[in-house]
């Protein structure tokens, strides 16, 4: 079915979810680094997905992105720093965490993550990364990452599964 052929009365929540979110499923592969994109709610929604993958042995490195300063209950921190503190509390080893504290938006999250990956792990030694963000943010984030990352690095989506009807209704 072509999207251009869909009539308004044919739209269902399930069809909208399928159109927006198909082909962004996690493959379950092991990777060289897990990249978590920043947001004010990244610690609540995105970080647990990354930590689950880390504890499952899919990677021993996590890059936390987000330089935007936010007011959290414990004080004002960058998004990445707030995730860092939570990651330590959830059993991630300090030496397995990298912070990208400069970015202010999705494009910068990915650009500056590349810089940090080069500085810490060397891009030529990286073959696969796991990109963690919310489901509704994944298609755009994945397109940006696949455009900006070197061709030899496979970017695997790992969406935090919130479907559009859950975001609207719940």
Segments (PLM) and residue ranges:
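A structural signal for short, hydrophobic/glycine-enriched beta-strand patches
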Residues: 1-170
């Amino acid at each position: 079915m072509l999207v251009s052929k869909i009539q308004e009365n044919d739209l269902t929540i399930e069809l909208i979810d399928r159109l927006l979110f198909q082909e962004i499923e996690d493959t379950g592969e092991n990777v060289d680094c897990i990249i978590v994109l920043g947001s004010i709610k990244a610690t609540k929604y995105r970080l647990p997905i990354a930590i689950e993958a880390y504890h499952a042995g899919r990677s021993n490195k996590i890059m936390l992105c987000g330089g935007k300063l936010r007011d959290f209950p414990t004080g004002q921190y960058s998004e990445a720093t707030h995730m860092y503190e939570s990651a330590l509390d959830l059993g991630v080893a300090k030496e397995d965490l990298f912070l990208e504290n400069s970015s202010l938006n999705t494009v910068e999250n990915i650009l500056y993550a590349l810089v940090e990956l080069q500085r810490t792990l060397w891009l030529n030694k990286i073959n696969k990364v796991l990109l963690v963000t919310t489901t509704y943010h994944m298609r755009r984030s994945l397109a940006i990452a696949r455009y900006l990352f070197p061709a030899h690095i496979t970017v695997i989506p790992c969406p935090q599964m919130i479907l559009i009807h859950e975001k609207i209704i719940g």
